[in-house]
Amino acid sequence: MGASSPRSPEPVGPPAPGLPFCCGGSLLAVVVLLALPVAWGQCNAPEWLPFARPTNLTDEFEFPIGTYLNYECRPGYSGRPFSIICLKNSVWTGAKDRCRRKSCRNPPDPVNGMVHVIKGIQFGSQIKYSCTKGYRLIGSSSATCIISGDTVIWDNETPICDRIPCGLPPTITNGDFISTNRENFHYGSVVTYRCNPGSGGRKVFELVGEPSIYCTSNDDQVGIWSGPAPQCIIPNKCTPPNVENGILVSDNRSLFSLNEVVEFRCQPGFVMKGPRRVKCQALNKWEPELPSCSRVCQPPPDVLHAERTQRDKDNFSPGQEVFYSCEPGYDLRGAASMRCTPQGDWSPAAPTCEVKSCDDFMGQLLNGRVLFPVNLQLGAKVDFVCDEGFQLKGSSASYCVLAGMESLWNSSVPVCEQIFCPSPPVIPNGRHTGKPLEVFPFGKTVNYTCDPHPDRGTSFDLIGESTIRCTSDPQGNGVWSSPAPRCGILGHCQAPDHFLFAKLKTQTNASDFPIGTSLKYECRPEYYGRPFSITCLDNLVWSSPKDVCKRKSCKTPPDPVNGMVHVITDIQVGSRINYSCTTGHRLIGHSSAECILSGNAAHWSTKPPICQRIPCGLPPTIANGDFISTNRENFHYGSVVTYRCNPGSGGRKVFELVGEPSIYCTSNDDQVGIWSGPAPQCIIPNKCTPPNVENGILVSDNRSLFSLNEVVEFRCQPGFVMKGPRRVKCQALNKWEPELPSCSRVCQPPPDVLHAERTQRDKDNFSPGQEVFYSCEPGYDLRGAASMRCTPQGDWSPAAPTCEVKSCDDFMGQLLNGRVLFPVNLQLGAKVDFVCDEGFQLKGSSASYCVLAGMESLWNSSVPVCEQIFCPSPPVIPNGRHTGKPLEVFPFGKAVNYTCDPHPDRGTSFDLIGESTIRCTSDPQGNGVWSSPAPRCGILGHCQAPDHFLFAKLKTQTNASDFPIGTSLKYECRPEYYGRPFSITCLDNLVWSSPKDVCKRKSCKTPPDPVNGMVHVITDIQVGSRINYSCTTGHRLIGHSSAECILSGNTAHWSTKPPICQRIPCGLPPTIANGDFISTNRENFHYGSVVTYRCNLGSRGRKVFELVGEPSIYCTSNDDQVGIWSGPAPQCIIPNKCTPPNVENGILVSDNRSLFSLNEVVEFRCQPGFVMKGPRRVKCQALNKWEPELPSCSRVCQPPPEILHGEHTPSHQDNFSPGQEVFYSCEPGYDLRGAASLHCTPQGDWSPEAPRCAVKSCDDFLGQLPHGRVLFPLNLQLGAKVSFVCDEGFRLKGSSVSHCVLVGMRSLWNNSVPVCEHIFCPNPPAILNGRHTGTPSGDIPYGKEISYTCDPHPDRGMTFNLIGESTIRCTSDPHGNGVWSSPAPRCELSVRAGHCKTPEQFPFASPTIPINDFEFPVGTSLNYECRPGYFGKMFSISCLENLVWSSVEDNCRRKSCGPPPEPFNGMVHINTDTQFGSTVNYSCNEGFRLIGSPSTTCLVSGNNVTWDKKAPICEIISCEPPPTISNGDFYSNNRTSFHNGTVVTYQCHTGPDGEQLFELVGERSIYCTSKDDQVGVWSSPPPRCISTNKCTAPEVENAIRVPGNRSFFSLTEIIRFRCQPGFVMVGSHTVQCQTNGRWGPKLPHCSRVCQPPPEILHGEHTLSHQDNFSPGQEVFYSCEPSYDLRGAASLHCTPQGDWSPEAPRCTVKSCDDFLGQLPHGRVLLPLNLQLGAKVSFVCDEGFRLKGRSASHCVLAGMKALWNSSVPVCEQIFCPNPPAILNGRHTGTPFGDIPYGKEISYACDTHPDRGMTFNLIGESSIRCTSDPQGNGVWSSPAPRCELSVPAACPHPPKIQNGHYIGGHVSLYLPGMTISYICDPGYLLVGKGFIFCTDQGIWSQLDHYCKEVNCSFPLFMNGISKELEMKKVYHYGDYVTLKCEDGYTLEGSPWSQCQADDRWDPPLAKCTSRTHDALIVGTLSGTIFFILLIIFLSWIILKHRKGNNAHENPKEVAIHLHSQGGSSVHPRTLQTNEENSRVLP
């Protein structure tokens, strides 16, 4: 996409120095935009727009804030091009309605049809055509608006509606049809038939049928006639009748007359049904109804094991019947008869004879299901399956077997016991939601979370399933659904679980493995399969090795003959099978076998057994009778023998058969056969045989027979006692009444048992049957039977029990990362210790004791957790650093090294004071601490103030903060400690000496254990510690349960006295009517005392009452304080009687009697103010039970309390029944504190207390901000704000605040802790002709100063001045980016004139007068005023001497709009500030939607600033009314409005008496929420109320359900799924209806199979060898080196059979955008940035490249990087241009000439000399460069050559003078002639002339002036005699003489010279008084002058000699004056050889 950056709406800063304003702003905008993603964030790639496309495509995924993307409308849409902008909130501006779909023309209705516009006629829309009734559509029935070129058209032409045609109507005999058109017939055309008339128009034929038919259509395409045509027949005639399969016997004529009879017969193989003859009636009808001919039936089918009637017939007529009957032993299934049908078939289907079946199995399985077999025949099996969560206890099946002569079920219904799981595993560094003593039933879920560790700086991640569920293994034991997760640090997998089926190929001791590690496994010997490997995945879980190794199996075991095999689980190795025989057979051999491994094969451990029929011995013989049997020798199980008595003579009956006449062979142990009962007797009627009593003696005569009513008496043998009546009477049928007595031995007292009590201690003798009961003392378990019975043999049975000390079960817990230390035994008081490995700390109890809990011995604490010890982040030290990383975890043993920062720039060196290495260790409490304090970086010589000691204090307080080496500080122990005073000293290593173990904490005395109790020392017994007391089970604590070690004076003692442990007493046990209790002590009853009840006996010891209830109760306690009895006492009642039922607060409506008879019904009602729960009527059952369960009368509850900011459901009710619940919920933003539900108690109160709604609070903000501060609010409620502020020199990366916000139903901090990054500045800018003190190594830290200087160029003769600040400092801009404090200065060539350039434009101010100049002299002032949006006074800037404008900081400030209004229920987000140009954003609280603009900007309005938009409104999000459900309703406190957070609770309708009719399936409560913060939706679908034990029809996509046409299914019903073609099933094919309307197992799903994933160029994917992939399978792509993966790294096979997402591609690695800039040059970027790409650097003309000319994209490790940075473009300078003889150039003498500068040459002019020079060569040369970039001149310098003109004439003469030199013949240009004057004349002016190039002499401007010497008018002391003239001429002499008293000083004579002076100078006359002094002074002066003259003369001579040598070609022409006077010679010079440059 074309990404462009807009101009910032507000200027960010001045443009870069040296750039014009237009360019500087753009450059700065680019820089700002490049910085924005870091500072403010970025936008992701915008969504694909269906109506528009980007003008330029790009592969970018992220775009900086402020980026523009340009779009144009797609074909089919109209609109202008537009742009979207990435806003500061990282959201793209909207593009809605920018492009509108083009419209096709309005489609016309087809004739006789219409067009249906579905959704408009715009691009992409579709229209439909239809025809009016009777017309058919010719053409396309629809059209779509599509693109065609630049417009849109309909893709199909308008169709035609053609009238539906019909063919010709059918013709009829003797008639015709009438129609308006006889050729064309269309839809709706009607034709009417009529019969042809006879001659004369008479009616001959009758029209029979519909007279009119019409043209219609069934498919709107083809026309058909509405019915058959009528017929025209002669009246009273009939057409021939037609009988299918029949033959007309009569003549077959075309017509039959009225009343004519015809006859039929059927074709062969058919029989007739109906009349053979029919008669012709009026209107062509035959009567009676025509017959039918039906086929004859063949003989019916034979049925196995059945007979049928009429076996002798071969043919059967329709309607004939046959009857079936089965053989004996079989039941007839189906109809007993079949009938022959007219079609020749038998109906109904033939029956079958099936083996007899058992009756329906009537047993019910509570909490389970009974699975019935297909049939109930012999051998049929009924299976018992428990519901999910229950395990089977008992037989899993019942078989239909033959028992005697009957078929019965061989076992009863088992029991389904609820499954419970052990306590969920404890995990290190984590916790679960289970409670310590909680019970975990099947289905219970437990959630795991990891502990936060802000003190360690460590965050743990939960690896594995966060939720585990209590489920079961195949054996029905409770197990957790998956292993407990673990809390670990991401990046490694723990060691994998041990596999039962496989083992590692190579063993390893590693405990963790990096992601991607693979471990190779091979199957164990009991399994088979290929080797495989598992891999540590990215989610830190090992890949699954399911179904890799399969368990070897044995062969399917055969059923033994007359037996069966029971496969318990399967037939794999290790499994066991059981054998059993059918009833009546015994098992010979092994009853079980195990599948074992032998070598590599699996086989059964034993051979199958044999089932042998159980034999019986001969049946008993009887006197006077015999038995009858089919076989009198062999008798087996089931054989029946029948007895009969011998008849008398003549066959008369003599004996009576007394007893069962038949007995059968059976078995009690399935091994030995016995007869079912004693044989009967054959006795004489009304006689009895002698009665037999074992160990008894018949006192009466012992005869062989006794008469009716005769009485006999018994007594027992010595040593035996009688039980029962002594006398019995002979009754009819040889019976004695009452029942015969028994004689049993007498028992001695039973044995005493140690630590036990027994009942009936006061008795010496015990009758047989008498029982004694044993009970153990508390803390002991009874081993053996609890009671002993006196046997008839005089012994006690069974053996006496023993009382053993109670023991706890084996301690099964494992301690990960620790050890469990076991005791010698596990008896009460035993202790298991837990010790953690080094580096781990114990979380939980350090020991578990075996204690007595109630009557059980249990371990009092579960396994603790050994959590790894972590240390907090090591302390940060000023001026130093450590080797720890910012987010590193510091486990036990980790070492950290400290070093001090080097500060060479500061001139400071710090030394590390203290230990340089500290190690993570632990304190006595197991907390992670560092081995020593962190060192410090300081300047040597002083210790810092010592740490505060908990155990000691300074003797003398001091405020000093540092102390010199050697300082000692004195300490004394604090009151809680004891020890001598001590001192610490500041050592040479600047650390204080250690005061270890100087003061020790005072301790209390060791507390004694109370009797029957124990003391628990929590930590120690030192001052401040606490101990707890507890009593052993059965004792209560009297006194204080804890004590603290406190200080009193100087002594430590316990705060309270030890308590007393008193045995818990119980009151007297309850008394019962008609019974009493037995106990060793009937007065005192304590915890553990057991009493046993028994009922009183009637007269003679007979049993009168039945004991109903628990016979024994024991003393226990619920609160360890008050003793109570374990349950109610039993009752002694008369059998089949009930005591009056008692209902609290209930009234018995029936008569209140003491006893009620069996099945008697009583009725209750409740007292006023109470409501009944349960049945009103109950019935007396056996054992004193009333059924159904008694009702209860409970108080009515008033409405529950209302709570602020909360509501409860139901809320509309006035009265609440006991047990009813109400549910509380809070408004959004509030948390419920307390119980969520209250229930109405039977006392009429609500329990527990009502909750309250508190404003939601976020958890403590635990994040730390290194190099910054976290500013906390006053509270942590919703809306609270935590601010983050970085220290100076650091910038915030991330959000500057974190708000406590509502997310869903939780309150969370919306941002995590940001990072404070060190601010760095880029390398300081390089300047031309200058340098800085910065290093080239990289970024410069905040605060660093850089100095600039200009380069010296003495070789160039140039000097540069530094313009700007010479020092810049690394500081930061408002966004935290590192910037330099001011622009870099520049080095400008020093020039005399000083000007400032045009000042930069200020964003905040404008000049009062427009600026048009480009340069301003030093001192110029410009006046400015603030722009709109800013305020401040007018100010001015001045051009300073350093050619920089004066500073303008803080002159104008942005105006403020003030705080923006905060919307109610929302908040304002101030991004930067509220000043002009700033933007603030609005957001609404959770549950509210924003109406209005989400942002507003502070803009100019008039002379002020204001927010451009009003604050939006936060409107609460509402939901539609919650969905209604069948058979149920919802409760809510408001049924009209449903706002966000509103909770509604559903419940199902109940029956009239409150009984449950429906089951609520699904979430009981749903709440109003929102997915887009705009529209309210309900959190989930509502639950359903379905019939109890019913399931709704499950739906599986792409599957077919069998059966599929029902909406409800019954409990345990099974349905099957199969997938549609092309789909595969994942999951179970069958599911079963479970309770709660659920299907189990989980519903399957049908997914398409995926083909292999696509191959990609330069890449590969995993699982490349696989052909088919199941849904959910993943493949992972990777690229070859040098290629990057673009797209998703993994694809997964979707249920639709596709791969998702799209396959990635491998693109050549690319370098990042090359962001470097090249001042004075260009960066040439390549077409792409892939590896090998080259960025070239080209300097602008006049600059040369210093550095590399290109940077290549190269591979460095795994990253693509540019291999060189940006070079520098230096300005090119040329050396000074060459000088030329007789010429000059325009260059300056100041130094180098810049590139491009042109220099012009010209030849010197010499008009005075008369010479002219010509320029030979280029007159201009330009500074350019050679290929190496050096400055060179464009061409060589030119030269000046003399032009040769005409010679000059003879030189002119002058007055009083002449030229010297001889006369020459030719005077050439350039020749010089010198002139001299005659003696007495002096030359004035130039003394020469020269010949010019024009051939004339230069101007003669000299002359000869006469020489005159002046004489002073007055001379002191001169002789007056002398006559002096005023003027003397050249050559004149004067002589001087002085007057007396004067002395002549000087020469007495002097001559007038040619230069108008006297030589020697005129003398003076001086007074003689000063002669000596004057003479001395003059002499010295003269000598000094002469010396100087002499030296000067020597030097001059030397120079002249040199000049003579330098000019050997000079010609001197001496022209002497005529007078012979000495004159200075003049020289005539020539330039004939151009050897000298003229002056």
Curated annotation (Swiss-Prot):
Tissue note: Present on erythrocytes, a subset of T cells, mature B cells, follicular dendritic cells, monocytes and granulocytes.
Major location category of this protein: membrane
SS bonds (residue pairs): 43-86, 73-99, 104-145, 131-161, 166-215, 195-232, 238-280, 266-293, 297-340, 326-353, 358-400, 386-416, 421-470, 450-487, 493-536, 523-549, 554-595, 581-611, 616-665, 645-682, 688-730, 716-743, 747-790, 776-803, 808-850, 836-866, 871-920, 900-937, 943-986, 973-999, 1004-1045, 1031-1061, 1066-1115, 1095-1132, 1138-1180, 1166-1193, 1197-1240, 1226-1253, 1258-1300, 1286-1316, 1321-1370, 1350-1387, 1396-1439, 1426-1452, 1457-1498, 1484-1514, 1519-1568, 1548-1585, 1591-1633, 1619-1646, 1650-1693, 1679-1706, 1711-1753, 1739-1769, 1774-1823, 1803-1840, 1848-1891, 1877-1904, 1909-1952, 1938-1965
GO cellular component terms attached to this protein's record: cell surface; cytoskeleton; extracellular exosome; extracellular space; ficolin-1-rich granule membrane; plasma membrane; plasma membrane raft; secretory granule membrane
Effect of residue 1590 to E: In MCC(b) antigen
PTM-bearing positions, type Pyrrolidone carboxylic acid: 42
InterPro entries linked to this entry: SEZ6_CSMD_C4BPB_Regulators, Sushi/SCR/CCP_sf, Sushi_SCR_CCP_dom
Region of interest (Disordered), residue spans: 2017-2039
Cytoplasmic side: 1997-2039
PROSITE patterns noted in UniProt: SUSHI (PS50923)
Extracellular compartment segments: 42-1971
Keywords: Blood group antigen, Complement pathway, Disulfide bond, Glycoprotein, Host cell receptor for virus entry, Host-virus interaction, Immunity, Innate immunity, Membrane, Pyrrolidone carboxylic acid, Receptor, Repeat, Signal, Sushi, Transmembrane, Transmembrane helix
Keyword Signal: yes
Topological relation to the membrane, as annotated: Single-pass type I membrane protein
Protein localization: Membrane
Recorded GO MF terms: complement component C3b binding; complement component C3b receptor activity; complement component C4b binding; complement component C4b receptor activity; virus receptor activity
Similarity comment: family membership: Belongs to the receptors of complement activation (RCA) family.
Role summary: Membrane immune adherence receptor that plays a critical role in the capture and clearance of complement-opsonized pathogens by erythrocytes and monocytes/macrophages. Mediates the binding by these cells of particles and immune complexes that have activated complement to eliminate them from the circulation. Also acts in the inhibition of spontaneous complement activation by impairing the formation and function of the alternative and classical pathway C3/C5 convertases, and by serving as a cofactor for the cleavage by factor I of C3b to iC3b, C3c and C3d,g, and of C4b to C4c and C4d. (Microbial infection) Acts as a receptor for Epstein-Barr virus.
PANTHER family linked: PROTEIN CBR-CLEC-78
Subunit note: Interacts (via Sushi 1 and Sushi 2 domains) with complement factor C4b. Interacts (via Sushi 8 and Sushi 9 domains) with complement factor C3b. Interacts (via Sushi 24 and Sushi 25 domains) with MBL2. Interacts with FCN2. Interacts (via Sushi 24 and Sushi 25 domains) with C1QA. Interacts with CR2. (Microbial infection) Interacts with Epstein-Barr virus gp350.
Designated name of the protein: Complement receptor type 1
Higher taxonomy: Eukaryota, Metazoa, Chordata, Craniata, Vertebrata
Gene name of the record: CR1
